[in-house]
């Protein structure tokens, strides 16, 4: 086994780690101590729940609060945490906790998993990731407890608060409130809405950005280009989405803000999406497709990819050099962003086609929304998830898996190159 892992690429190790965690999680959820008395849990639903948790999505075919015991809910929370931080990061944390050293291969896997430029200082960075996560989740749980303790006994309110904080920071829209209600009962609670929004926002900008904000003490001029891009795009998408939802939907500003934030990979809902207008759902599909930022707990094609696409289009249209925030943008960045976007659209198109084939009675709007939500690891739904057939559930699982790993990681699993030794003449293609 050890020799096999040494021969495997970092991408394959990461992919195998996520797949193994999903199947182990499904087995744990099938244990009698995980399921409430009188509940007949099918394996496909346990597998779906595990995949949704590990891929930090939040789509569910069974209600977490009504189906699983406290132990089962704990398993789901652990799977969310593993999925959010990444299997490689959690493995590294265990290795460091027992006093072992991480070898060179392990550092390469961690570098790729965390989207880092190099493996230098990787151990220190992993430690900061765990400390940052613990800090945000504990503070989030304490603040959420203030709200939940009004409606539940203290011990149960504590459990709900911890689960909610873990789910929110890891951009996974799970809840244990029961009856598939998510946070609809708290849509007018401004305090809980803002706490949840902040947990989602910081979980979605990435650990590199959080570290830089702290180290450089909020001084904009000292931030790297990556941090400036992530913060600019995150704020722009959040504000833009809130304005659109305020205009297209019948909801107050706090509801519009919450839906704008949660659409970018979190998946909590305070309003029924089945009642949204087509314009509102279209805006939400776009936000779900873009998703969070690199190195974060969220999915989607990432905010930096959208920024690179905008810059590339601007450069091509104006025939000027690629630059932003007083930095020069490498041409390869636009090519990589284009590949990610095209692959993302292609995956969603195939998934939507398959869902329409398996579920002929579902409107294409709902099918497109469901598959974009799965690919973006969001967890929002127009209400069709619980009624999906087994084939549709498996399709959704594959979509969540691809979305969590990322299109490029999936592509590299089958990509081999020995280098091109033959040189060909340049060709020209008419574009546009």
Regions found by a protein language model. Give the residues of each.
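Membrane-proximal intracellular helices of multi-pass ion channels
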Residues: 1-432
């Amino acid at each position: 086994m050890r020799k096999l892992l040494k021969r495997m690429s970092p991408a394959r190790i990461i992919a195998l780690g996520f797949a193994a965690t999903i199947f182990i999680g499904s087995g744990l959820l099938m244990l009698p101590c995980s399921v409430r008395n009188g509940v007949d849990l099918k394996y496909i639903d346990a597998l779906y729940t595990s995949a949704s948790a590990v891929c930090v999505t939040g789509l569910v075919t069974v209600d977490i609060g009504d189906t699983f015991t406290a132990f089962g809910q704990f398993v789901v929370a652990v799977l969310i945490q593993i999925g959010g931080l990444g299997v490689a990061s959690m493995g590294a944390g265990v290795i460091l906790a027992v006093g072992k050293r991480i070898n060179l291969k392990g550092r390469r896997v961690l570098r790729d998993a965390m989207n880092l430029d190099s493996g230098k200082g990787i151990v220190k960075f992993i430690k900061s990731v765990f400390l940052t996560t613990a800090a945000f989740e504990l503070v989030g749980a304490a603040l959420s407890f203030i709200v939940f303790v009004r409606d539940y006994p203290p011990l149960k309110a504590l459990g709900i608060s911890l689960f909610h904080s873990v789910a929110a920071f890891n951009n996974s829209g799970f809840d244990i409130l029961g009856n598939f209600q998510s946070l609809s009962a708290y849509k007018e609670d401004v305090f809980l809405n803002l706490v949840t929004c902040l947990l989602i926002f910081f979980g979605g900008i990435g650990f590199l950005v959080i570290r830089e904000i702290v180290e450089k003490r909020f001084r904009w001029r000292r931030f790297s280009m990556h941090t400036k891009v992530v913060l600019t795009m995150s704020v722009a998408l959040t504000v833009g989405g809130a304005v659109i939802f305020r205009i297209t939907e019948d909801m107050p500003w706090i509801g519009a803000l919450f839906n704008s934030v949660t659409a970018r990979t979190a998946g909590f809902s305070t309003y029924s999406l089945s009642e949204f207008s087509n314009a509102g759902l279209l805006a939400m599909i776009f936000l779900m497709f873009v998703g969070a930022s690199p190195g974060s707990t969220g999915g989607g094609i990432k905010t930096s990819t959208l920024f690179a696409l905008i810059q590339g289009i601007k450069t091509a249209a104006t025939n000027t050099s690629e630059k932003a925030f007083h930095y020069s943008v490498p041409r390869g960045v636009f090519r990589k962003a284009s590949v990610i976007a095209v692959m993302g659209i292609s995956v969603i198109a195939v998934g939507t086609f398959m869902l329409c084939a398996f579920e002929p009675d579902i409107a294409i709007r709902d099918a497109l929304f469901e598959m974009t939500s799965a690919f973006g690891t969001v967890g929002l739904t127009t209400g069709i998830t619980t009624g999906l057939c087994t084939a549709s559930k498996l399709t959704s699982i594959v979509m969540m898996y691809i979305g969590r790993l990322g299109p490029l990681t999936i592509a590299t699993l089958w990509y081999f190159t020995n280098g091109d030794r033959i040189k060909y003449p340049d060709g020209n293609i008419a574009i546009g």
